[in-house]
């Protein structure tokens, strides 16, 4: 089948993306088994345009209405049968479910693949929400707001959200540019940018997902040991300054335990992870709703979370109960626990007290003043700290005095140095996860609709949550509490939990389970991503990771993922792992934007995204923003990430990635000279890269001027899709004598190309025979990969009026040459009526009459024409023909679905052509055609000797006038006759070589000729189709039509021309199209 009927339902496989799309047609008629069958159980004639002897066999062609296209139907399918087979195949390989749909217990029978059924909400929107919301929202956003201030925090959120939104726009364009099978984001990037970039970015994406698992696990451990079960800690600080080391060691031990457990869960079965995904998502949503509920409640009833201040310094509340220096117990003033910490004595002695403690008062302020308290103004500005700085509240009185070093653990201090760039790197992971929807592309009912809508809505939703959360935190929570990363000043409560309603535990438990769920999702997705890369076999040493369990589970890839995640666990700091994660995701997003920009600027014919709201400038802005964020957040991490990607790229290039995925980078090769030509030499272009590379065959008049300049106009309008254009012509004669003439003709053509704005090359050859010259052009034009795949040939006007067969012989021979060379052929008829480049069609239709599948040329050409300003306003209509046994209603539905996947906007109409009796007009028209052929033959062969001699003289004088650049020499018998100089010898020669029994004795007997039945059927096809086409498309700006193939034997050449004339009668502008034997359009991205 052609490439768009892709994966049979009964045996889906993953990883064979490069095998999904065929490059050439197969014989749909199964001719090897049944030579006289059309593949539908009906008999047909073995050759079109049969001789009378063959017609006398009485073989009746199965479909009278399509008799003219009999030869095409030998090797190409009818539209009805093509669409029928299309709907019986699934257009998607299965996604994550394919591993569960493994072989049954017997090991020989696979479960039937279910049709993808997930919609936008469940398939894209909610998974994106779950992956975007994560540990940073609950553990670091409040700290970021307090440190950067509300204004700079909003700026950080804006930059990061703009980056992901621009990336989502580019991703939506790529995702809707055809069907994206399972493989999701990696598939899109690799098939758009090629194996080198695809492998490098794919591995960066894999490493990012793997480190995300480590980050989520570290977040879960932080919540567990800090807020849920602090006594569970294994390591305790040995001294006042050893808290950091003890915390890191606890994170490493518990992180390793959690990672091992999660890896075992994923190994046992991904279905358990998917079943709990909804629960984890519910935890996230409930937690966020509780934050908003708490913010609203704080307006009239703020929660009680007092913060103890010494002067303007924040004290760590988990070490004492009473926020005062002294307390009255039984009418006696005694020292509090706080006094003993600062004075190292339980008594009220001041000898060894901390000077700052003695000079400043201890006060208590509300940690959550509420939205009505006006703290927003205080929290607008930044308060960046260095490592070890004490968190202070501006505005509180404070006596300047030295503080003892031993007292430092009693304060809330900054554990890391902060700046705007550091916060960007830490926050960015909280906006990643936008590709969760595209990763499930194999499970979506309509990925081209769901991915853009769901992803962009999820980004807008999460962005609004982040923006509102920044403002809410700044308006409700005291600044010193916001800057308190671990909640030490509010009795080791999660800061965001202090605001939540009805209880802080809602946030604590919800965030814990959501981070655990996100970690499981990352450990599930990363091995499958590595498996997809390994199965593509672009990085040889990763090949082992493409294997797994019997049911397809990537066991070895899971093991490697766990080992890499363990490296992140050993770092043991959420704030250190987050920037690493940011680098890899930013690298991935950068190349998504690059892929979209490259495809848009190259304007490849296959670049037809259904998502229209993209622009190359937006993609470049997104790419620049990603690059800037990489270096802003951590320039050394950025260099390391780029170095890793560069090394992978060069390794794949060094290994020689012999993959052809139709990547956009190959389009750049057309402008890269020798290196590019050598690359293009490697093989035929992928279907996605196919564009009409034109060879325009021009006819020159006696003064070497272009006879039909509108052929060049048409070529320039068609090449709005860019690509290669070669303009060729033939000068008849000797090369030595006509070299100067050829140079003059070439210059004339170049001038005309410049006038018509045709960017390409010109080649004029000198040949003794025009037919041979054209054949040489068709065979040898171009260099390496820059070769033509389509020929534009002018129509032989006036062939009916000419008695000389050279008027149309060369045309048919050229058609045969293009067919033999497997080139597409475009024949614009009535070229003088085609629009110039200065005209504009403000309305109208381009009508496509799709009768026989030709590889998609008929679909692609109108799309390319509509890229030009002349045709841009025209709408596309596609007509196809239904026969008696076709379900026209179903055909229309199938055709609409097919066009939807091709990303083509067109009206669809199925025209029913029922079998009808051959009309008297058809019979008469056929009779006239055959009588004319016989008459012309007789006029050439049955003259008297005197008439022959006069005719010979006349021929010699008229030959120069009748001869054209596209006409060939006379038949062999005529050539042989001309070589004999003596009149008597020539006549004798003709008399001896012609048997009068082969033709009627005189013209009167012509009326008794009975027309050949095969010609009657073909004439019937031409007449009926012409009637239908003229009725439906008489007002169309352009009509595109399948061009029937020429007869296999030359006896029917003249009749073939008549059939084409009848087929196109009454139409102002017609483009006859004949495919080149390969697919040129695809539903895949």
Swiss-Prot record:
* Residues binding chloride 1, per UniProt: 433-435, 589
Q: Which residues carry this modification: Phosphoserine?
A: 24, 47, 51, 81, 88, 734, 916, 967, 1050
Reaction catalyzed: K(+)(in) + chloride(in) = K(+)(out) + chloride(out)
Residues crossing the lipid bilayer are 120-141, 150-172, 197-225, 249-271, 272-297, 420-440, 451-473, 505-531, 555-575, 576-598, 613-635, 636-651
Which residues are listed for chloride 2 binding in this entry? Answer: 589
Glycosylation (residues): 245, 312, 331, 347, 361
Q: Please indicate the ranges of residues that lie on the Extracellular side.
A: 142-149, 226-248, 298-419, 474-504
Phosphothreonine-modified residues are where? 983
InterPro entries assigned to the protein according to its UniProt record, in alphabetical order: AA-permease/SLC12A_dom, KCC1, KCL_cotranspt, SLC12_C, SLC12A_fam
Keyword annotations of the record? Cell membrane, Chloride, Disulfide bond, Glycoprotein, Ion transport, Membrane, Phosphoprotein, Potassium, Potassium transport, Symport, Transmembrane, Transmembrane helix, Transport
Keyword rRNA-binding part of the UniProt annotation: no
Q: Describe activation and inhibition of this protein.
A: Inhibited by WNK3.
Cellular component aspect of the GO annotation: lysosomal membrane; membrane; plasma membrane; synapse
What processes does the entry annotate via GO biological process terms?
cell volume homeostasis; chemical synaptic transmission; chloride ion homeostasis; chloride transmembrane transport; monoatomic ion transport; potassium ion homeostasis; potassium ion import across plasma membrane; potassium ion transmembrane transport
Q: Which cysteines are joined by disulfide bonds?
A: 308-323, 343-353
Membrane topology reported for the UniProt record:
Multi-pass membrane protein
Renumbered to this chain, region (Scissor helix) spans: 665-681
- Give the superkingdom in one word: Eukaryota
Q: What is the effect of changing residue 135 to A?
A: Decrease in Cl(-) efflux and reduced sensitivity to KCC inhibitor VU0463271
Quote the subcellular location field of this record.
Cell membrane
| Function statement | Mediates electroneutral potassium-chloride cotransport when activated by cell swelling. May contribute to cell volume homeostasis in single cells. May be involved in the regulation of basolateral Cl(-) exit in NaCl absorbing epithelia.
Family (UniProt): Belongs to the SLC12A transporter family. K/Cl co-transporter subfamily.
Q: What does the record note on quaternary structure? A: Homodimer; adopts a domain-swap conformation at the scissor helices connecting the transmembrane domain and C-terminal domain. Heterodimer with other K-Cl cotransporters.
Q: Kindly give the NCBIfam families that the UniProt entry links to this protein.
A: 2a30 (TIGR00930)
Q: What is this protein called?
A: Solute carrier family 12 member 4
User: Origin organism of this chain?
Assistant: Homo sapiens
> What gene is this protein a product of?
SLC12A4
């Amino acid at each position: 089948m052609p490439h768009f009927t892709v994966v049979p339902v009964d045996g889906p496989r993953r990883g064979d993306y490069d095998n999904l799309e065929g490059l050439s047609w197969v014989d749909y008629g199964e001719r090897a088994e049944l030579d006289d069958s059309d593949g539908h159980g009906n008999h047909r004639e073995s050759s079109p345009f049969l001789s009378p002897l063959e017609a006398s066999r009485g073989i009746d062609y199965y479909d009278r209405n399509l008799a003219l296209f009999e030869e095409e139907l030998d090797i190409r399918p009818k539209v009805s049968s093509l669409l029928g087979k299309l709907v019986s195949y699934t257009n998607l390989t299965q996604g994550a479910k394919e591993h569960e749909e493994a072989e049954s217990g017997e090991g020989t029978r696979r479960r039937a693949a279910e049709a993808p059924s997930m919609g936008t909400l469940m398939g894209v929107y909610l998974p994106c929400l779950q992956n975007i919301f994560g540990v940073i929202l609950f553990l670091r956003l409040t700290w970021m707001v307090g440190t950067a201030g509300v204004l700079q925090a909003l700026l950080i959120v804006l930059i990061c959200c703009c980056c992901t939104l621009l990336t989502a726009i580019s991703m939506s364009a790529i995702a809707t540019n055809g069907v994206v099978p399972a493989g999701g984001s990696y598939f899109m990037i690799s098939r758009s940018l090629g194996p080198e970039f695809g492998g490098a970015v794919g591995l960066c994406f894999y490493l990012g997902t793997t480190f995300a698992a480590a980050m989520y696990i570290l977040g879960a451990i932080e919540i567990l040991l800090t807020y849920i079960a602090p006594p569970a800690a294994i390591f305790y600080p040995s001294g006042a300054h050893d808290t950091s080391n003890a915390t890191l060691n606890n994170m490493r031990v518990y992180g390793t335990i959690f990672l091992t457990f999660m890896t075992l869960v994923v190994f046992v079965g991904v279905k358990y992870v998917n079943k709990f995904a909804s629960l984890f998502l519910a935890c996230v949503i409930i937690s966020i709703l509780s934050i908003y509920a708490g913010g609203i409640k704080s307006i009239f009833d703020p929660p009680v979370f007092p913060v103890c201040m010494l002067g303007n310094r924040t004290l760590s509340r988990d070490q004492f109960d009473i926020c005062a220096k002294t307390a009255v117990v039984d009418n006696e003033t005694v020292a509090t626990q706080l006094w003993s910490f600062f004075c190292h004595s339980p008594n009220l002695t001041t000898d060894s007290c901390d000077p700052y403690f003695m000079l400043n008062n201890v006060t208590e302020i509300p940690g959550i003043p509420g939205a009505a308290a006006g703290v927003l103004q205080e929290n607008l500005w930044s308060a960046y700290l260095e490592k070890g700085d004490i968190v202070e509240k501006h505005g509180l009185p404070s006596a300047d005095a030295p503080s003892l070093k031993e007292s430092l653990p009693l304060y809330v201090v900054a554990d890391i140095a902060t700046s705007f760039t550091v916060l960007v790197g830490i926050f960015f992971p909280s906006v990643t996860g936008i590709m969760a929807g595209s990763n499930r592309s194999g499970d979506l009912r309509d990925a081209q609709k769901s991915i853009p809508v769901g992803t962009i809505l999820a980004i807008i939703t999460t962005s609004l949550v982040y923006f509102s959360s920044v403002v809410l935190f700044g308006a409700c929570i005291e600044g010193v509490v916001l800057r308190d990363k671990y909640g030490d000043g509010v009795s080791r409560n999660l800061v965001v939990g202090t605001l939540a309603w009805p209880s802080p535990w809602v946030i604590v438990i919800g965030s814990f389970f959501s981070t655990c769920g996100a970690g499981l999702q990352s450990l599930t997705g990363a091995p499958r991503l590595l498996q997809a890369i390994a199965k593509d076999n672009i990085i040889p040493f990763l090949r082992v990771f493409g294997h797994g369990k019997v049911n397809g589970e990537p066991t070895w890839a899971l093991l490697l993922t766990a080992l890499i995640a363990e490296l992140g666990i050993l770092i043991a700091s959420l704030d250190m792992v987050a920037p690493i994660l940011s680098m890899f995701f930013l690298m991935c997003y950068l190349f998504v934007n690059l892929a979209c920009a490259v495809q848009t600027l190259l304007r490849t014919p296959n670049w037809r995204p259904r998502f229209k709201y993209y622009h190359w400038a937006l993609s470049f802005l997104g790419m620049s923003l990603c690059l800037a964020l990489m270096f802003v957040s951590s320039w050394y991490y950025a260099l390391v990430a780029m170095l890793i990607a560069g090394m992978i790229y060069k390794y794949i290039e060094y290994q020689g990635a012999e993959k052809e995925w139709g990547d956009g980078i190959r389009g750049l090769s057309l402008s890269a000279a020798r290196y590019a030509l050598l690359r293009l030499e490697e093989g035929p272009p992928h279907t996605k890269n196919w564009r009409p590379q034109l060879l325009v065959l021009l006819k020159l008049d006696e003064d070497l001027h272009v006879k039909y300049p509108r052929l060049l106009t048409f070529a320039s309008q068609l090449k709005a899709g860019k690509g290669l254009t070669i303009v060729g012509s033939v000068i008849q004669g000797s090369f030595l004598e006509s070299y100067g003439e050829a140079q003059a003709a070439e210059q004339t053509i170049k001038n005309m190309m410049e006038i018509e704005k045709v960017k390409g090359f010109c080649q004029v050859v000198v040949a003794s025979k025009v037919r041979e010259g054209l054949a040489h052009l068709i065979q040898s034009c171009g260099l390496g990969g820059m070769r033509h795949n389509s020929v534009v040939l002018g129509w032989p006007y006036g062939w009916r009026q000419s008695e000389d067969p050279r008027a149309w012989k060369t045309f048919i021979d050229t058609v045969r040459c293009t067919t033999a060379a497997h080139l597409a052929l475009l024949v614009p008829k009535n070229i003088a009526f085609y629009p110039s480049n200065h005209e504009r069609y403000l309305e109208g239709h381009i009508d496509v009459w799709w009768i026989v599948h030709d590889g998609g040329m008929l679909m692609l050409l109108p799309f390319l024409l509509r890229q030009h300003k002349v045709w841009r306003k025209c709408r596309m209509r596609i007509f196809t023909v239904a026969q008696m046994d076709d379900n026209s209603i179903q055909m229309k539905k199938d055709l609409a679905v097919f066009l939807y996947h091709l990303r083509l906007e067109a009206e669809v109409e199925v025209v029913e052509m029922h079998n009808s009796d051959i009309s008297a007009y058809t019979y008469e028209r056929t009779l006239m055609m055959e009588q004319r052929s016989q008459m012309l033959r007789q006029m050439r062969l049955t003259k008297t000797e005197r008439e022959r001699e006069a005719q010979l003289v006349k021929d010699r004088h008229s030959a120069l006038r009748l001869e054209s650049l596209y006409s060939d020499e006379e038949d062999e018998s005529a050539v042989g006759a001309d070589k004999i100089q003596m009149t008597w010898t020539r006549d004798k020669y003709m008399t001896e070589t012609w048997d009068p029994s082969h033709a009627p004795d005189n013209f009167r007997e012509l009326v008794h000729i009975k027309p050949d039945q095969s010609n009657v059927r073909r004439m019937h096809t031409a007449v009926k189709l012409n009637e239908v086409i003229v009725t439906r498309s008489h007002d169309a700006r352009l009509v595109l039509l399948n061009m029937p193939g020429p007869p296999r034997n030359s006896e029917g050449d003249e009749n073939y021309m008549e059939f084409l004339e009848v087929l196109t009668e009454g139409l102002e502008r017609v483009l006859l199209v004949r495919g080149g034997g390969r697919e040129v359009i695809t539903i895949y991205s």
